[in-house]
Amino acid sequence: MKVFILALLALAATTAIAQLETTCSQGFGQSQQQQQPGQRQLLEQMKPCVAFLQQKCSPLRMPFLQTQVEQLSSCQIVQYQCCQQLAQIPERTRCHAIHIVVEAIIQQQSQQQWQEPQQQAQHKSMRMLLENLSLMCNIYVPVQCQQQQQLGQQQQQQLQEQLTPCTTFLQQQCSPVTVPFPQIPVDQPTSCQNVQYQCCRQLSQIPEQFRCQAIHNVAEAIRQQQPQQQWQGMYQPQQPAQLESIRMSLQALRSMCSIYIPVQCPAPTTYNIPLVATYTGGAC
């Protein structure tokens, strides 16, 4: 009898998975074509979470099991799969996975269902998603996930302007100051040292929960300004190059400013990019 019940449960799970694949295949087709390989893999892994959060599952009817076992629904099976997949994703990359889930849900929802601008709707979805997944799966999701998403376009632009000294310093676009009186027995400051000081001071004034976003903006500004040939170890497509520059910026700013930057800052570990790339630009 136990073998019979287990076989029926396995059949129910198989049916639920088949329903999930049928439901998701159409919605994910277009978005996956635009995703990078690492993102596509994460999106595939998080399909059960997308299906569950959209409530695209319905109870399975198994009347002959009423007296034997508790009725399992396809929603319960998909919920279990979602939590299982999320638990297998390293903590430092869960933010990235959740971002992908939110984008997939918003792309599949008709625009008429949102009564507010899409960006605000995305922030609201992120908050709801974090609450649901944390409670539903009893799993740790970094707090920075939500806080990073609450920055609007204007705030991001302000952050980028605020950290212009960091962009300048990391690009090594500063040169020693010519001092007419070198005989003075004092270490002569250079423009690089001045810019470094300004960078660290500005970064320390940014709240901890927003430093990740600020560094992302700095790295993106550097990547856009530098010719592709100046980066060794950066190849197409663009996304790995951006992630590598974020990682380089993190390393430089952590050691240079002696300031706290959340460990979860980059989600780029999914792409297996080396920790260090060689920069061939000028030096101070």
Swiss-Prot record:
The keyword Disulfide bond applies. One of its GO terms (molecular function) is nutrient reservoir activity. Coiled coil: none annotated. Keywords: Disulfide bond, Seed storage protein, Signal, Storage protein. It comes from the Eukaryota. InterPro entries: Bifun_inhib/LTP/seed_sf, Bifunc_inhib/LTP/seed_store, Glia_glutenin. Contains disulfide bonds. Residues 1-18 form the signal peptide. Seed storage protein. Might be integrated via inter-chain disulfide bonds within the glutenin polymer. Belongs to the prolamin family. This is Avenin-like b9. It comes from Triticum aestivum. The lineage of its organism: Eukaryota, Viridiplantae, Streptophyta, Embryophyta, Tracheophyta.
